[in-house]
Structures are given as structure tokens and as C-alpha cells.
Amino acid sequence: MTQQRPIAVLGGGSFGTAVANLLAENGHRVRQWMRDPEQAEAIRVNRENPRYLKGIKIHPAVEPVTDLLATLNDSDLCFVALPSSALRSVLAPHAELLRGKLLVSLTKGIEAQTFKLMSEILQDIAPQARIGVLSGPNLAREVAEHALTATVVASEDEELCQRVQAALHGRTFRVYASADRFGVELGGALKNVYAIIAGMAVALGMGENTKSMLITRALAEMTRFAVSQGANPMTFLGLAGVGDLIVTCSSPKSRNYQVGFALGQGLSLEEAVTRLGEVAEGVNTLKVLKVKAQELGVYMPLVAGLHAILFEGRTLNQVIELLMRGEPKTDVDFISTSGFN
């Protein structure tokens, strides 16, 4: 009997670790690659990722490794959970090894220099690979603690979607499929910006009306932008859009929410990110999204307002006053009503 090939998870962060555990619990051998040999040794010895998922036991079938070449050679299904700033530099030298492999991005970010999503970078590096993304309301710790969770795997490759569903679907983790890879991935990247705003609002003691307004206007804003890029607006009414937006803007477990909360408490951006100790993709996404929205002429007042606070020296009160005095627009303007006649 031929032994099953291991599944690779690239990245030693919280979500990569949670996904590695899920795969192992479903009976798969998993190789989790990380750069830091000390982190790999700590997981190997203590069966715990103390920096990113303290208190969560790592399944015995998860093997922490630091040899990327061997990991890629041995696996045909790879989940990529690398920070957006590192993905290209880590994988580009090994482009030939990625030919024909199934590469599924778990990273919700945008590359600063190119405004490319992670799956687009994977396609640049390995045009012969089969590409997908996994996104949705998936807080890493809750996934690791087996809270009931649903996610979306998106790809034009139906067989890839089925393979990922079979690998991850379990008693507490439900995997839906979508063909709108771009929309699913864009939703996951954009919502990080609005989670920072939501965290600030909570820290400042703003009411439930305000939080509801922020979330719904954020949905309108991010969908408006996505539609301008060719995404399907209906994608944003599902798990990868409104689902991910709600959980990220409502939970103190969200990294971007934590950054916003710290900012609302009076910390500087540098202090807030240092306190977090992990990558908060929303900060980087905000910078490139503000520029791109201006280039395209897409109306994104919440993005402009947060950028003004973090990078242009404006106070929160100044931005709030400007936003509330702005001319009201149509409530839902990103779906044509002709489609519902």
C-alpha cells in the first residue's frame, strides 16, 4: 500500500498552526514549515506553539520542519500561511518545485509594491501551479479550540476545491466552495482595515448604533471597491464578505481589532503593533488601498479617514466631524436593482 504524501503548511503563525492541526485531526500527515529553528524545536518537544497559540496542543501528526526544499518536494498540496510581505521572497527561489502543485493561500493581505493579492503572487511565481484561497470568519484560536466554524475555499479549479474540502471538512469545521477566487480573497484582505476602525470605536466607548453603522458602511465600501475591480458583489454577502467582516470587527481575538483598540486607548501605531507581537495585515493594506482607491476614483471615506488619523496627523474628532458632515449617499449602491426585477 502506498503511503499517503504529507500535506504542507508553510508558516508558523497562529492560523497556519490551526489549519495544520485540523488536517492532522482528519488523519493526514502534515509538515509545517517555519523559518525559526527554535520555534520548530519548541513545537517538536512541547507539542505547543507558545508564541502564537499558547495552550493549544499540537497533534502528533504535525511535524514542524525548517527545510523548505524537502517540504515542497514531498507534498503536492500546500497551504500557504506566510505574511504578505514575505510570500514572494520565500517562494520565488523555489518556483520550479511548485509546478503542478495545489497551492492554497491562507493569507489575507495585499502586496504593497504591486497591489496583488496572495494568489496572484503565487500565480506569478508558479504559473503552472493550481491556485486557490481559503477565507472566511476564521479566528485562529477558535478554530484551534474546535468552535463551530465555516470557511470558503475559492478557485476556478473545481477539483482543487473538492480536494481541500475533503482534507479540512470535519465535525467542527465546514468548508464551502466558490468559483470567485478574486472576490473571496479581496474580501478577506479589505476587512482587516475596518477591524482597526471597529477596535478604535470600542476602546472609545462608542455605542451599538455606531458599531452597526461602521460595519454596514464598511461592507458597502469594500464591496464598492471590489466591484470596481471585477468581483461578484454577491460574494460579499457570504462567509468571505459580511461573515468575515462581522467576526473581525466584533472580536477582541482579531489581531487588527486589537491594534485599533490599542490606538483608541491612546497608543501610537508603533506601540500598538509592538504590543500585538504579530503581523496585523490591515495596517499595510490601508496604505496601498488608500492610494488605489484614489487612482480608481472609488469613494471610500472610512479608508480615507483612518489613513488621515494614522499617517496624516488628523485627530479622531476631526475625522468623525468630516465624515458625519459629508453628503449622504445611497445606502446600497453596489448591486444593480435591475437584477432583482
Curated annotation (Swiss-Prot):
Enzyme class: oxidoreductase
One BP annotation, GO: glycerol-3-phosphate biosynthetic process
Record keywords: Cytoplasm, Lipid biosynthesis, Lipid metabolism, NAD, NADP, Nucleotide-binding, Oxidoreductase, Phospholipid biosynthesis, Phospholipid metabolism
Pathway given in the UniProt record: Membrane lipid metabolism; glycerophospholipid metabolism
Catalytic residues of the enzyme: K191
List of residues binding sn-glycerol 3-phosphate: K108, G136, K191, D244, S254, R255, N256
GO cellular component terms attached to this protein's record: cytosol
EC number(s) given by UniProt: 1.1.1.94
Places the protein is found: Cytoplasm
GO molecular function, one term: glycerol-3-phosphate dehydrogenase [NAD(P)+] activity
Binding locations of NADPH: S14, F15, R35, K108, A140, R255, V279, E281
Gene3D superfamilies: N-(1-d-carboxylethyl)-l-norvaline Dehydrogenase, domain 2 (1.10.1040.10), NAD(P)-binding Rossmann-like Domain (3.40.50.720)
Function: Catalyzes the reduction of the glycolytic intermediate dihydroxyacetone phosphate (DHAP) to sn-glycerol 3-phosphate (G3P), the key precursor for phospholipid synthesis.
NCBIfam families: PRK00094.1-2, PRK00094.1-4, PRK00094.2-4
Family: Belongs to the NAD-dependent glycerol-3-phosphate dehydrogenase family.
Name recorded for this polypeptide: Glycerol-3-phosphate dehydrogenase [NAD(P)+]
Organism: Pseudomonas fluorescens (strain ATCC BAA-477 / NRRL B-23932 / Pf-5)
Lineage: Bacteria, Pseudomonadati, Pseudomonadota, Gammaproteobacteria, Pseudomonadales
Gene that produces this protein: gpsA
